[in-house]
């Protein structure tokens, strides 16, 4: 029997990159997966198609999780389609860097709304349906430890996420719901290609600082998330796990 057979997972921001890899990994382990997207319907549909072609179950649901009504609608769609909810992966995130002289109110609010408020709202909605053995996994970043110039706002969101996750781990523990964090290091995704990082001197520098000597891949993160979603991690809660090739 697959590790997640009979379970239902919602993965936010799952139309590409790390989120897409997580959705596919959970489905491979037997979960029915709700592939959330904010705007990239084609990407989400492609993830669903890949999952169903491999014999899994998945649907795509559009929602901006920084909006309470939409976050609730996402969770309700999962329960309506599959009858339950067992796993929430808060992967949606915005990463934009700016020097302190260039930070604006709009920049700050946009990033905090998705990276922090979105996690709170999705978790609030999901917590009403998660039962004993439920698992919440929040995707953070090693920028909370590796203090990069121009990342003040982004790093601030991930520091807040780590703190919130610790609080929620204690708050939801009486209900036997686990809350953990996965903090990726540098991972090659569509976003790093769009930003011009992949194949650049910056990427070479990041790899040089990585003890395992290579860039991360989305599947490197997905495997850790799949473990935390499963009953193999039943005694693990309140943890921040760096999946960074040794960067800390």
From Swiss-Prot:
CDD domains: THN_reductase-like_SDR_c. Keywords: Oxidoreductase. InterPro entries: NAD(P)-bd_dom_sf, Sc_DH/Rdtase_CS, SDR_fam. GO terms for molecular function: oxidoreductase activity. The active site is at residue 154. Belongs to the short-chain dehydrogenases/reductases (SDR) family. This is Uncharacterized oxidoreductase MexAM1_META1p0182.
């Amino acid at each position: 029997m697959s590790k997640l057979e009979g379970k239902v997972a919602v993965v936010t921001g799952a139309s590409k990159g790390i989120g897409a890899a997580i959705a596919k990994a959970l489905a491979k382990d037997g979960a029915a997966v709700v592939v959330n997207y904010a705007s990239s319907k084609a990407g989400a549909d492609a993830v669903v198609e890949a999952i169903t072609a491999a014999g899994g179950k998945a649907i795509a649901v559009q929602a901006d999780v920084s909006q309470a009504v939409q976050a609730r609608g996402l969770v309700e769609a999962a329960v309506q389609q599959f009858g339950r909810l067992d796993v929430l992966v808060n992967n949606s995130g915005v990463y934009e860097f700016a020097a302190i002289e260039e930070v604006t109110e709009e920049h700050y609010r946009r990033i905090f709304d998705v990276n922090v408020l979105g996690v709170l709202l999705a978790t609030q909605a999901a917590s009403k349906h998660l039962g004993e053995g439920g698992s919440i996994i929040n995707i953070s970043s090693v920028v909370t430890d590796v203090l990069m110039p121009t990342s003040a706002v982004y790093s601030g969101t991930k520091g807040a996420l780590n703190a919130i996750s610790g609080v929620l781990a204690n708050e939801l523990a009486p209900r036997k719901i686990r809350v953990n964090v996965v903090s990726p290091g540098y991972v090659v995704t569509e976003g790093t290609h769009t930003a011009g990082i992949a194949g650049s001197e910056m990427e070479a520098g990041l790899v040089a600082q990585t003890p395992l000597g290579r860039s991360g891949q989305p599947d490197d993160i997905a495997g850790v998330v799949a473990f935390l979603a499963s009953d193999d991690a039943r005694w693990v809660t309140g943890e921040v796990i760096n999946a960074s090739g040794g960067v800390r």
